[in-house]
């Protein structure tokens, strides 16, 4: 019995959840610092919205699907650089994060086990004068032990 208690305590310590948003350590590769194994199956989530935007316009997108507790989204150019700025639409459930630039990442805020999300809407503003393809990459956390890293994507053409 004592061994089971020690094992349970060790497992509880090794899995960290970030209910107040993704940590800056996740900026580079969008990997949560949960200490659990990531999923390689097709994620039950998608990013929906227009597939093109002018460089002087704001783009509104929605991450949706099955229930989830956390997320982290970046827009990346063809050279895998994080580009553009996010604007929060739902300030109860999302916040921006400064990874390589101001407001260049959006993540969850105040995730609670009993109150999962099924969707989150956000705005993105392209860099001034930018033209080309941008890939939105999302990590979605279903539970502390179940998450998909960068597998939820959407391609956008910026004109």
From Swiss-Prot:
Residues 1-17 form the signal peptide. One of its GO terms (biological process) is innate immune response. It comes from Drosophila melanogaster. Gene3D superfamilies: Reeler domain. The gene is l(2)34Fc. This is Defense protein l(2)34Fc. Residues 18-159 form the Reelin domain. May have antimicrobial activity. A late response immune regulated gene that is negatively regulated by spz during the immune response. It comes from the Eukaryota. InterPro entries: Ferric-chelate_Red/DefProt (IPR051237), Reeler_dom (IPR002861), Reeler_sf (IPR042307).
């Amino acid at each position: 019995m004592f061994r089971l208690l020690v094992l349970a305590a060790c497992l509880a310590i090794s899995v960290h959840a970030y209910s107040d948003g993704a940590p800056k350590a996740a900026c580079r590769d969008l990997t949560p610092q949960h200490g659990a194994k990531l999923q390689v199956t097709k994620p039950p989530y998608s990013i929906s919205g227009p597939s093109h935007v002018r460089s002087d316009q704001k783009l509104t997108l929605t991450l949706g699907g099955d229930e989830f507790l956390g997320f982290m989204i970046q827009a990346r150019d063809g050279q895998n650089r994080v580009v553009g700025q996010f604007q929060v639409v739902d300030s109860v459930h999302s916040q921006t994060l400064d990874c390589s630039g101001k407001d260049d990442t959006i993540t969850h805020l105040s995730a609670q086990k009993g109150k999962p999300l099924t969707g989150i809407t956000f705005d993105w503003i392209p860099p001034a004068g930018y033209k080309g393809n941008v890939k939105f990459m999302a990590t979605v956390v279903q539970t502390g032990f179940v998450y998909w890293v960068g597998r939820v994507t959407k391609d956008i053409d910026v004109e």
